[in-house]
Curated annotation (Swiss-Prot):
It is found in: Cell membrane. The keyword Transmembrane helix applies. Keywords: Cell membrane, Membrane, Transmembrane, Transmembrane helix. It is a multi-pass membrane protein. Belongs to the UPF0391 family. This is UPF0391 membrane protein LPC_1949. Pfam families: DUF1328. It comes from Legionella pneumophila (strain Corby). Its main location: membrane.
Protein backbone atom coordinates (compact mmCIF):
# COMPACT_ATOMS: atom_id res chain seq x y z
CA UNK A 1 0.00 0.00 0.00
CA UNK A 2 2.88 2.34 0.75
CA UNK A 3 4.31 1.62 -2.69
CA UNK A 4 1.10 2.77 -4.38
CA UNK A 5 1.03 5.92 -2.26
CA UNK A 6 4.60 6.70 -3.31
CA UNK A 7 3.83 6.08 -6.99
CA UNK A 8 0.79 8.38 -6.92
CA UNK A 9 2.79 11.02 -5.03
CA UNK A 10 5.43 11.01 -7.77
CA UNK A 11 2.73 11.23 -10.45
CA UNK A 12 1.16 14.18 -8.59
CA UNK A 13 4.53 15.96 -8.42
CA UNK A 14 5.05 15.50 -12.17
CA UNK A 15 1.49 16.69 -12.91
CA UNK A 16 2.04 19.75 -10.71
CA UNK A 17 5.25 20.58 -12.55
CA UNK A 18 3.39 20.46 -15.86
CA UNK A 19 0.37 22.30 -14.47
CA UNK A 20 2.30 25.18 -12.93
CA UNK A 21 4.56 25.45 -15.97
CA UNK A 22 3.61 26.61 -19.46
CA UNK A 23 3.06 23.13 -20.83
CA UNK A 24 -0.51 22.88 -19.51
CA UNK A 25 -2.04 24.85 -22.39
CA UNK A 26 -0.40 22.74 -25.07
CA UNK A 27 -1.26 19.53 -23.24
CA UNK A 28 -4.90 20.62 -22.94
CA UNK A 29 -5.10 21.18 -26.69
CA UNK A 30 -3.62 17.77 -27.41
CA UNK A 31 -5.95 16.19 -24.84
CA UNK A 32 -9.00 17.71 -26.57
CA UNK A 33 -7.92 16.33 -29.93
CA UNK A 34 -7.27 12.88 -28.45
CA UNK A 35 -10.60 12.93 -26.61
CA UNK A 36 -12.60 13.52 -29.79
CA UNK A 37 -10.49 11.05 -31.75
CA UNK A 38 -11.12 8.27 -29.23
CA UNK A 39 -14.79 9.26 -28.94
CA UNK A 40 -15.23 8.81 -32.69
CA UNK A 41 -13.36 5.51 -32.58
CA UNK A 42 -15.56 4.33 -29.70
CA UNK A 43 -18.75 5.12 -31.61
CA UNK A 44 -17.46 3.39 -34.75
CA UNK A 45 -16.46 0.24 -32.87
CA UNK A 46 -19.73 0.26 -30.92
CA UNK A 47 -21.74 0.36 -34.15
CA UNK A 48 -19.54 -2.32 -35.70
CA UNK A 49 -20.02 -4.50 -32.64
CA UNK A 50 -23.78 -4.09 -32.63
CA UNK A 51 -24.19 -4.68 -36.36
CA UNK A 52 -21.69 -7.52 -36.51
CA UNK A 53 -23.35 -9.67 -33.86
CA UNK A 54 -24.39 -13.07 -35.00
CA UNK A 55 -25.43 -16.17 -33.17
CA UNK A 56 -23.09 -18.02 -30.83
CA UNK A 57 -20.02 -19.57 -32.45
CA UNK A 58 -20.35 -23.20 -33.55
CA UNK A 59 -19.10 -25.82 -31.15
Amino acid sequence: MLTWALIFFIIAIIAAAFGFGGIAVAAAGIAKILFFLFLVMFVIFLIMGLLGRRGPPPV
